[in-house]
Amino acid sequence: NVDAVVDAARHFGVTARVKAERSWIQVYLPSPTRLTHGKHHPISDWLRRLEVWDLRSWEKFIPAPVFSLAPNQIALFLRHLWATDGSVSSSVYYATSSRRLADGVAALLLRLDIQTRLRSVRAARGRTQYQVEVSGIENERRFAEVVGVHGTRGRQLEQRIVAKADVKANPNVDSVPAAVWEHVRHKSLPTAGMTARQLATALGMSYCGSALYKSGVSRERLGRVAAATNDHWLADLASSDVLWDRLVEIEPLGPVEVF
């Protein structure tokens, strides 16, 4: 991590000075020019332009230009970000006290086709902590392949992936809402000339009446329903890249300009 900081500083014309303390390493980044009124340090000036200079931990966020980067640049950004407050031990997650930063990290990971869960941990003292957790072994493998972690944690991640090499991925990363059964009952089955009992037989399951329609359906099962009824709309829904998630919170943001 120190080498990465030293190398990055060179891009601003800054020659870093590294000093080993008792149990940590201090990196000094002296300005390459004399600082006077209106003349800022090139690194702090850059951070000001990104609007992330001198923020508290709970105020931090991903600068807007990062979201416009190419996938390989986003991966590099996350690789070094994970080396700060990320974890790869019991699970792969990034921790922060800033909800906005957590949402930004999750959005960047989704750009790389890596799905996450957002958990909030309320502490007895202090602020709520947010954990952006990489969901499931398949996403962990993709995270290790596409992003990784800089430094020692990167080697820990590799060991974690090797140790879980025989773990089979669960394909059910989400469930299509139960409302889709209304389409099956009133469109798919009548068009196919099938009854609900015949559909249950085609799916290799016992007929359970209306109980089947009360819960969400996995993509795998929905795909089999689509095949049994020859419903192309259902087939497209089962294979789409739209992820379904339960709405758990609505937070007002105040008046905003819309277009």
Predicted region positions:
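Internal intein/HINT superfamily modules and their associated LAGLIDADG
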Residues: 1-259
